[in-house]
Amino acid sequence: MNQTKTVGIVIPIYNVEKYLRECLNSVVNQTYKNLQIVLVNDGSIDENSLSIAKEYTLKDERFILIDKENGGLSSARNVGIEFFENKYIFETKTQKYKPDSLVEFELKNKENLYKINKIYKSSKSFYDIEQIQNFSSPRIDYIIFLDSDDYWELDCMEECVLRMNGVDVVWFDYKLFFQDIRKKKYKTQMEYFDFKDGTIIEPRHWIDRAKERNIFYFWFAWQGMINFNFLHKMNLKFINGIFAE
């Protein structure tokens, strides 16, 4: 498969030390490799979430780790969006290139709305100190969000990119995993809408289906891939501090 399109992945992290490795392994081992992966540590206070995030960032040059004060899930996702929008200016005190290390950056922006403390990137991403000092956000074609207590099938990105041609959003279904509790009957949103795999949905069609089936609520965050240019032009961000953000 042609892998010229770059996918930006945003993964908020908050006290998920039990699940984070499974999540990140599912990302690292995707069959689609052209990925730029932003981990946003939202002020985790457990013992290992931040250290696990640093471990993966050190090993894989596709990762960048942003450590910020706790602000909620929406704020963490918005940091990822703004990173890919190239809204952040980075500076580093690093004066010497050190192999196999994490390079630390700070924000040079006058405004730091989301209270970002540090940014980390593997030295594997750079050839020399000049490249480190000129670090900026990569350009992406598509963006997708993943919660850090979830994980993907290993061909998830490949299957999404295959379907992104000519559309703004690819919406996919999901499965629930029940651990140590009785499995409940559960219908996903896609099952309520009863859209079949591969269906092209126009906005009017989607609204009509919601009316027909008396579906009065809908959410979308991690259930699909979005054309980043579409998201940027719409200037869409997640709303902070709301229920089920």
Give residue ranges: language-model regions.
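Nucleotide-sugar donor-binding/catalytic module of glycosyltransferases
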Residues: M1-E245
